[in-house]
Each structure stands twice: as C-alpha cells, then as structure tokens.
C-alpha cells in the first residue's frame, strides 16, 4: 500500500447473531409496552443461551405485556424455527425477572433538578431529568449518500443481504447466525478508493461444502451489494475461514443485550460513550441523546457546514440541560466549531424532554433499530435521520 493511504475496517452481524437476538427481544418488549403506555419506563435486558431466554430489568408501566409470547414471536421472525438449528422458538424456555424502576432514579427523572429548584418557567416545568449521567456521541460524514462511513455502511448491507437470501430461499442452506466485515482502503486525500478485504462468516447446514458457500457468498451476497468499481483483482475474500460454521446462534455463544454497541453505531469510525441502546425507553439518554447527537451531526454535514462532524453530549442524572456540548469537524468545517456549538444550542432542544418531542421518541419504533444499525439505514427513515434543520443551521452560522 502506498504512503499516506490507510485501511479501516468495520463489522456487522445478522439478526440471528445471539447478541442481536437479545437486542431485538428487548426492543420488541419495549415497543409492545409503548404501544399501550407511551410514558412507561423501560430498562429491559435479555440473555439467550442454549434452550433458554432470560428477560430481566426494571419496568414501570400501567399496562400488561405477555413477555414469553413476545419472545417466542421474535425468535420465530428471526428464523430459529427448527430444533436442528440449535434453538427453537417453540421449545426454548423463557424466564422473566422484572422489577420496577428505582424510586430514587424516578424522582430525578420525573422532575428535573432545575424544576425542583424553581429555575424553570411554567412552559418548561414538564421537562424531565436525564435518566443517568453519561456522554454520548453522534457522527456524520459525506462518504455515502446516507452520510455514514463507508465500512460500516457496506458491512450492514452485507449482513442484511445475508439474512434476505436466507429468508427468500435464494441460498436455502443458510441458518440465521452470521457476521460480516469490510476493510476499505482510503487514498491520499482520505477518500474511499477500493475494498481491500471482505469477511463473511455464515451459519449453514452441515452437508454443504465450503466451496459452494464461498461461491454463493461472492455471487449472491457481495456482488449484489458492493459497487463493482470498489472491487478489484486484489480484493481479498475470507468466507467461513474456519471451514465450518454449523453450530451457531445461542447454542454456540451466549447472547446479551447491548454487546454490539460499535455495530449499532459507526463501526468504530467515531467515538462511543459506552452506553447501549436496546431495551431502553427515551428517558435514558444513553439512547435518546445518542440519536439526538446523530441528528445534529447529520444536519451539519447535510448543510455543507462540514464534511465530517462528531457531536458529543453529556448529562448529569436528574438534570435536564446537558452539562456539555462539543462539536468536532476534524478540520473540514466551513465555520468555527464554537459557532457551530452556539447554533446547536439555539436550534436544538437537547434536554431529554426536548429530544423526545423533537424526535417523537415515545412511539414504538425501536425493534426495527435493533439489527443492521441505528443510523444511516436505507430501508427505514428514522426521525433522527431527517435533514430538516439544514437551512436554519446555515442561517444561524452566516
């Protein structure tokens, strides 16, 4: 590789990966609760292992949800429908261990510190406090149409295609578990130039030979997703490099909610505050503020104010206003970062209640986020992916 060039790699996993199964179950439960009780407080964690699903957490709601039925339906949709897959929606055990949200936490969330101290106007008094302290990042760049880094974008598309060819019977020997990984080579101007390496590991029936899997993955998955101009005779393909992937899903690995936080976001291309998303209602700023930070960053890039933008938000538990807002444009900004921070403060209400209203986060939209990325999706336009603040940002930064 020539000087001043670089490689960057991101990975994704399919909906049948055990960690992603856990995320989808947690968000399916969240959505079902929000359908009947939009103001519910939900922190739902799922563990999947051989023959067992354990759902635990803290849920405060006025409604009833049949959690075991939801679990089985979600597992069925993912594709674990036969015992020979190592996990079956009909025969798996489902255990629940649910408590209510701590009264100490609820007190600070229900009424923010500013309200308790009389520092809010009547119009602001309904503002809720942050559900926890923490820092969250959002990112956008102009590498793709959806303003995402190319490596994670392609990795997600490959994972989604891997599931699609299985469900549609195009490749009928596949099973639900799978992973993808894409290495992109960037040129001297830090622009994506070619794909250096693609890795696909996919669960399969025991009688299939690896040669057929490799041929089908290249022809029916990779070539259907990756633009041909990014592939060349030097691109390396590693298809099931262990040689065999029959045992997978919860039988092969324990799955836990929140263990794929880099897959969920930017594939390592931007920083991460450490908080997971799935199973959490929007009062949890781990989720809602990360969505808001993406919304801000994407609008800054879409407005042409920067080619690359990372936004950091930080909160204190029980306090409505963020304790800090930071913008980094990595030298690509058309205006100063200080000016961008001023514009962000003026245009976006980044209190938890403000984020919930701005992005309409009390709706049951979360299960669809739980596989193939929360950001930059081509199949679904989530509220935080809209670029409806560009004109106002431009006007505020003139």
UniProtKB/Swiss-Prot annotation:
PROSITE patterns: ADOMET_SYNTHASE_1, ADOMET_SYNTHASE_2. GO terms for biological process: one-carbon metabolic process; S-adenosylmethionine biosynthetic process. SUPFAM superfamilies: S-adenosylmethionine synthetase. ATP binds at residues 17, 177-179, 244-245, 253, 259-260, 276, 280. Binds 2 divalent ions per subunit. Its cofactor is Mg(2+); K(+). Its main location: cytoplasm. CDD domains: S-AdoMet_synt. Keywords: ATP-binding, Cytoplasm, Magnesium, Metal-binding, Nucleotide-binding, One-carbon metabolism, Potassium, Transferase. It is found in: Cytoplasm. GO terms for cellular component: cytoplasm. It is an enzyme of class 2 (transferase). It catalyses: L-methionine + ATP + H2O = S-adenosyl-L-methionine + phosphate + diphosphate. Residues 101-111 are annotated as: Flexible loop. Its EC number is 2.5.1.6. Mg(2+) binds at residue 19. PANTHER family: S-ADENOSYLMETHIONINE SYNTHETASE. This is S-adenosylmethionine synthase. It comes from Oceanobacillus iheyensis (strain DSM 14371 / CIP 107618 / JCM 11309 / KCTC 3954 / HTE831).
